[in-house]
Structure formats: structure tokens, C-alpha cells
Amino acid sequence: MNPRVAILAAMAVSFAFAQPPNATDHWVTTWGASPQARLAAPPRPANAQAPTAPAAPAPPVQVTSFNNQTLRLIVHTTIGGRRLRVHLSNDFGLAPLKIGAAHVALRSKGSAVVEGSDRALSFNGQPSCTIPAGAQMISDPLDLELPPAANVAVSVYVPGETGPATYHGTGLHTSYISKAGDFTAAPEIAEATTTQSWFLLSGIDVVAPADAAAIMAFGDSITDGATSTPDTDRSWPSLLAQRLLANPATAHIAVVNEGISGNRVLRDGQGVSALARFDRDVLGQSGVKWLVIMESINDIGQSLRATAAPSDAITVGDLTAVIHQMIERARAHGIKVFGATLTPYEGAAYYSEKGEEVRAAYNQWVRTSGEFDAVFDFDAATRDTSNPKTFRAEYNLRDHLHPNDAGYKAMADSIDLSLFGPQPAGRATGSAAR
């Protein structure tokens, strides 16, 4: 074949792979997780005060590299579709990442998949690919009838040493790591070890009708769902997704959780700073129509705690300037932006009265500045009326920073669903303060 003809034919195939089947259909992200790398803790400034209490013991070191192994990663999607594509991430890899094979299937239970649902993924028509360091790779679209709120198994085989693998720490779903070998097509992975993190996987898109769209939930651990019950989907974004799916007027709307536990706005924490990852984790997703921003409490807590160096101090203006940048970027892409107030934190390890003053001022800005298209008042939904600095007793977890399952439900239930579409008469939808 003429070389030029061959190139044009390959381009035509690639273009065909990229297009939804109908002109009115489009790609919408139904599930996502923000990629991150394990970062070393920054050194303590020489002029910082000594801590008044011993530091908490370090968590166990988690395996973060793989060699000749299969990862079966279990995720819970939101809206369904008849075609899908998968995003794999080597964002924080130190070298090119070889993917030997990858499959997607509906999960049955444990590491087992539903018979007949397994599909091999391809990348530009090939069963394997190499992802450059710092990059992502999107699979070719494939046909798979994906119901709403599906448990999906994405299996990825890495034939060689990965080095430190890009991951998302707070997965809150049990996933499986094989012994040596390619088990991507296996109905079940026997003798697998388990993890509550997701490795190498950052998103799933579906082909959906023209009116389908996604809400991006952008934040820190309180958005990530930290301390909620694992394998039950009880983060506030998951619970919001359940409310939307249960309502015929909003069942076409996906909710994508792009929170990172320990994330910060002004500087890197767990994961790069919120502003640094904003384009990738919000603007780079498919079918985004709405954005919820709930982030700043880690900046307040870490920078204003008693042991922080004076040079670390921040003001509410520092925070709002960065949030304003996110709002402007989102609006330039036609995305509506909802601001969420910060939930109480008195009693948390990094609580301070100065920090509480900044939290209150930040919440007042969210409520009254007019910067947002609407406000989700999570503070009002969860605070103790007799002591607004802390959670209501029934929502309070042991660390006084994260709500329990009931608290996350209160947050999700406080959201006015009419912001996303007309509601059936008589249906309670929650509220949105302005």
C-alpha cells in the first residue's frame, strides 16, 4: 500500500474511534479520581515551635510499585452508557510506563467479574501501550452496556517494574493486586492482596445523550470521603449522585469526585496544589457543566496551627484570590461554579482560634461575595447550633475534622437538586444558600 494512503487510513480509523456514534451523543465522565504521588513531608522550619504533643504514628507504608502483576481496580460509576473509554495515568511516574494488557468488565463480587461482560481495551488499535512519564493515555472506545451506578472492574497488567506508581490514596473501594502474571482476562484473581487505593487509573467516560453532563466535586479529604465506611459509597459526592439518579429529572447527571485527602489550595500537600491540578482534574474532564469547590481547610489548619512558623501564616484574601482564579477558568469553559462553605473543625489536631477566624471569614465570603452561581452551605448543614465551631454530635467523628457517614449524608441532602434541572411537584430537594 502507498505509505501516504496507509497513514490516511490509520488517521481515519483513529478519528472514527474518537467519535460518539450519534451526532447528539457526547462523552461524559462518569467516574474519576485525581492522580497523586506520595510526597515526602516538608522539613519543619528551624524557627517553628516544638509540638506540644507527640506526633501521631506514621501510617503503614503501602506498596506503590509493581512488576509483572495485574491490578484489578474496582470503581463505582454514576451515569450509564452503551460505550466507554478508560483513562490510565502515569502523571507522576518517573519513567515511561508499559501497559501489557488492560480489560474492563462489570464486577460481580470480590475480584470476580460478571460472566460475558469482560472486554479487552485497546490503544490506537493495539492491545498494549507505553505511557510517557507525566502523561495519561485514553483507551479506544468500546461497546459495553454500562448501567447507572455500576461496579466496574478495570484490570491492568504491567509486565515490568513500574517504579513509584501514580495512584489515588483514598479509594475507599477494595481493589486487588495479583501475584506474578497477566490475569486481566481472568474471571477472578485468586490469592490476590487487597488495597483501598487506586493505581494507574484516573477516569472512565461514557457516551451519553446530549442532555447528559457532569458535576465535578473538587476538594480535599472531606470531598474525597475520608473516614466514610469503605465499600459503601458514602462520601457526599457519592450520596449526591444517588439522589440525582433516583430523580428522573436529574438521572442523566454524573458526579465525579476529584477530591484529594490532605490537598491544599496555596501549596502542595497530598497531591499538587488545587490550582496546579485544576486544569487536569476539572477542565480536562468530559461533559463538565457544573463545578463544586470545597477546599481551604488544610491551608487554614496547617498554616495557622500553634506549631506553624510565622512565615506560614495566611489570610482569607490569600485563599479567595486562588478560588477566584478557579472560578474564572471554569467560567471561560462555560462551567457554572458552586461554592461550598467549610465544615467545622474545633477539636481537630490542627485547630486554632486564629484558624477559626479565617474559616468564618472564608465562609462569609462564600455566602455573600456573589462570586458563585449558588452556595452549598455545608457548614450550616453540619454545625452544632449551640457551638457552631464544631459538628453536631450525631455527625462528629473521632478526629473532629471529618464528618461520619450521617454527616456526609446531611451534606448531600442539603443540596438543592433544582440547580441541576426541574423537579417533580412535591419533591424535597434540599437548599442552597446565597
Regions found by a protein language model. Name each.
Residues 225-238:
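Glycine- and acidic-residue-enriched helix-capping/strand-helix junction motifs
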Residues 1-7:
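Bacterial N-terminal signal peptides that target proteins for export
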Residues 228, 260-317:
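Oxyanion-hole/transition-state-stabilizing segment in secreted/luminal serine hydrolases
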Residues 17-218, 228-231, 249, 420-434:
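N-terminal secretory targeting modules
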Residues 85, 214-219, 223, 253-259, ...:
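Structural recognition of the beta-strand scaffold that forms the well-ordered cores
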Residues 92, 160-161, 221-225, 260-265, ...:
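Solvent-exposed loop/turn segments at secondary-structure junctions
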Residues 275, 301-303, 342-434:
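Catalytic His-Asp segment of secreted/periplasmic serine-dependent ester chemistry enzymes
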